[in-house]
Amino acid sequence: LMLSFLTLIGCSRSTPPEIDLTQIDQALQRTSNTTAPAPHSDIEAAAFERFTHFYNEYSADRIASNVRNLYAKDAFFADPYHLVQGIDSIEDYFIAMAAPAQSCTFEIGKIQRAENDFYCRWTMHLISNAAPDQPIIAQGLTHMRLNPAGKIIFHQDYWDTSVLLDRLPVVGFWTKLVKNRILKGMNHE
C-alpha cells in the first residue's frame, strides 16, 4: 500500500519511473485462472487477517517476519511508482520503503470479493523521519488475487500520488498550482 510514498521521502530519485502497463496486464493474465480460496472459508478469513495485521503496523521488522506468510513466491506487486516481481524483490522493496518512516499504519477497510478478485479501501497514516511534525494521511484502493493457499499472487495499489508530491519543496508548489487551477476552471463552468 502506498509504499512508494516512502521512496520520495527517503530516496534521491526525483521523478517516478514510467510504469509499463503491459507488465500489469501480463500479471493479471497470468493469475486470471488461479482459483482463490472458497468464499467465507477459513483460508480466506486467515488471508484477510494476515493482510490486515501486516499493514496495521508497517515496519521493517514486521515486513521481515511476515511478508513470506502473506505473499506467494512468485507474487507481483505494483503501485503508481514501482513494479516488483517475486517474493525476494517484494521484501527488499517493502523494507526499503519502510526505512524512512518514523511510523506508518494502515486502516484497512472491509475486503470485498468479486469472483477471484479482492478489493479494499485503506487509509495510510505516515510520519516520516524527514518531517515528523507533518503527518501525512492518504487514501487508496488495493486490488489483489490470492492462490488456493490464501497467499497474495497479485497486488496493485491505486492512490492519488499528489498527496506526497505536495510535500516536496519545488514539486509541491507546482502540483498545488495545477490542482488549484483545475478547481478554479471547474468552478467557472
Regions found by a protein language model. Give the residues of each.
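Low-complexity, intrinsically disordered terminal/linker segments enriched in charged
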Residues: 18-31, 156-189
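A short, structured loop/turn motif at beta-sheet edges
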Residues: 111-118, 145-153
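Bacterial N-terminal signal peptides
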Residues: 1-8
